[in-house]
């Protein structure tokens, strides 16, 4: 049951961090949408007339009574908290009771609302947030808030605002974030009374994300939910939706989003954990698609630190970083329980159509049910392993699959071993020498501008090109870069003939890696062809009589 609106006592007001001043069209949208979500709305309509500085937000939430309408625009009036202790167990998006009061100070504000079986009421508020006379109007249960002439009495503030296009882009991002955090809501947004943005509801964020990123398809995603217990013995959940790195990546980190308890937040520490988990799975200078939503006990979070409640202090930060990395590792695996089985990849359909026209085999994408069921059956051009599976077949490029295996072994154990005979390198610069020493190699002077390398990564010890490999390692990069270079040089070369046993061993090792989808450079390792796709290509659903023209 919703509490009535009341003005907070002074001892609670004194503890509340200063609320954010209404400083843009987006700030108005944010405050009104938060109120709508807190009211339990599952349909929100927004109408923006940016040139007229007008915004209207309508919802089908619980609505307000006549008494609430008379109090809602006073400073620190709220139904969401009552006392000091409530500040440490906040479950709503808003709690300070300042939104409507702040808006009334800089715009013309009117609110129409209806609660339960009450009659709908309409009220206009002055710039102090004081209500005028209430009028009865016919309205469905819910609330309609109209804000007009925003900053009309503050022309200097209007002139200092970003361009209208920039403000609209910020509003679009804001609505995207709300939609991801609250997927059950239907969104309809108008600009100057024209359709601008529509988002249909979904069971979770994986059904919302493809509506927001046009280049993203449902089958490009993996999602999972993990229930866990925090170090404080509290129940919590990680909800994760990621773009599979062998299918989708971005030029910038614009779709790495983090939410906590229904609110999008900024956290450089959690973002760093996400980037660490995706390291060496996406190509260089590319970024992952990732939506992370933490559902925590409200006592684990302090929302009362930032005016927009966008920055938080999270208890047990190191624990959460470790759990996030672990969850992403799990989602990046080949376990198909985190991959939708029924959704047909649009790109696969296009490939199948083209293949049928050209009478050639086609390639689709789908993960197996059991990573242990791949069986090596052949090798193509001494480059690709053909692996049979109960649901079709896979093509695996042998070099980059082996590279992934070796890279993860080097990550776990960067082993440097002594050389029986030192390798002599000439003309090394001081920077190259320091780089090899940083990697743990033993180096000694060996005459004029020559150096004796007395140790080497174990994978390179028996290679004939180990001197070239050492020169490559000396040219820079961190330890991870050196591990990638070593794995690449040491992996089975394309053009190498493999026996069935060798191919099977490689498949088994590769399937057990943490990130089997891409090589350390971000290239996809495998392609799959489903038996159902083969059946469609060969028209196996035809009736025998029809196929003979009977």
Curated annotation (Swiss-Prot):
One of its GO terms (biological process) is mismatch repair. Keywords: DNA damage, DNA repair. PROSITE patterns: DNA_MISMATCH_REPAIR_1 (PS00058). GO terms for cellular component: mismatch repair complex. HAMAP family: DNA_mis_repair. Belongs to the DNA mismatch repair MutL/HexB family. This is DNA mismatch repair protein MutL. It comes from Microcystis aeruginosa (strain NIES-843 / IAM M-2473). The lineage of its organism: Bacteria, Bacillati, Cyanobacteriota, Cyanophyceae, Oscillatoriophycideae.
């Amino acid at each position: 049951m919703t509490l009535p609106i009341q003005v907070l006592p002074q001892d609670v007001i004194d503890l509340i961090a200063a609320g954010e001043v209404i400083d843009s069209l987006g700030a108005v949208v944010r405050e009104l949408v938060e109120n709508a979500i807190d009211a339990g709305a599952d349909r929100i309509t927004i109408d923006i007339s940016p040139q007229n500085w007008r915004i209207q937000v309508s919802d089908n939430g619980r609505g307000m009574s006549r008494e609430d309408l008379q109090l809602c625009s006073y400073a620190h009036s709220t139904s969401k908290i009552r006392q000091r202790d409530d500040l440490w167990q906040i479950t709503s998006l808003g709690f300070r009771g300042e939104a409507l009061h702040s808006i009334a100070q800089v715009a013309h504000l009117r609110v129409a609302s209806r609660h339960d079986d009450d009659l709908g009421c309409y009220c206009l508020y002055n710039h102090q947030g004081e209500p005028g006379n209430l009028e009865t109007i016919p309205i469905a249960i819910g609330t309609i808030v109209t804000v007009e002439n925003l900053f009309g009495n503050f022309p200097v503030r209007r002139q200092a605002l970003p361009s209208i296009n920039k403000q609209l882009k910020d509003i679009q991002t804001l609505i995207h974030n709300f939609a991801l955090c609250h997927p059950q809501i239907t969104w309809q947004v108008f600009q100057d009374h024209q359709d601008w943005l529509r988002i249909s509801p979904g069971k979770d964020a994986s059904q919302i994300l493809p509506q927001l990123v046009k280049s993203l398809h449902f089958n490009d995603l993996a999602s999972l939910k993990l229930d866990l217990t925090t170090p404080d013995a509290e129940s919590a959940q990680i909800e994760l939706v990621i773009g599979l790195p062998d299918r989708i990546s971005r030029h910038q980190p614009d779709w790495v989003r983090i939410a906590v308890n229904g609110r999008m937040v900024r956290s450089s520490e959690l973002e760093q954990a996400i980037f660490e988990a995706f390291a060496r799975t996406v190509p260089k200078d590319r970024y992952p698609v990732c939506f992370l939503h933490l559902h925590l006990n409200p006592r684990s979070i302090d929302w009362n630190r930032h005016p927009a409640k966008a920055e938080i202090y999270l208890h047990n930060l190191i624990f959460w970083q470790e759990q996030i990395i672990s969850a992403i590792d799990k989602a990046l695996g080949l376990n198909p329980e985190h991959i939708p089985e029924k959704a047909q990849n649009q790109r696969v359909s296009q490939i199948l159509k083209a293949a049928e026209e050209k009478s050639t085999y086609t390639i689709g994408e789908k993960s197996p049910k059991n990573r242990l069921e791949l069986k090596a059956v052949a090798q193509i051009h001494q480059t690709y392993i053909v692996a049979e599976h109960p649901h079709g077949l896979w093509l695996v490029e042998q070099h980059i699959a082996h590279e992934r295996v070796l890279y993860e072994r080097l990550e776990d154990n960067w082993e440097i071993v002594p050389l029986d005979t030192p390798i002599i390198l000439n003309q090394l610069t001081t920077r190259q020498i320091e780089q090899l020493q940083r990697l743990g190699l033993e180096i000694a002077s060996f005459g004029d501008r020559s150096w004796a390398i007395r140790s080497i990564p174990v994978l390179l010890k028996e290679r004939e090109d180990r001197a070239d490999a050492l020169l490559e390692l000396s040219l820079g990069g961190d330890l991870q870069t050196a591990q990638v270079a070593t794995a690449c040089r040491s992996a089975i070369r394309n053009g190498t003939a493999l026996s069935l046993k060798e191919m099977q061993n490689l498949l088994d090792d590769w399937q057990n890696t943490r990130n089997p989808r891409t090589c350390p450079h971000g290239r996809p390792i495998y392609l799959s062809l489903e038996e159902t796709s083969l059946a469609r290509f060969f028209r196996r659903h035809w009736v025998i009589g029809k196929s003979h023209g009977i």
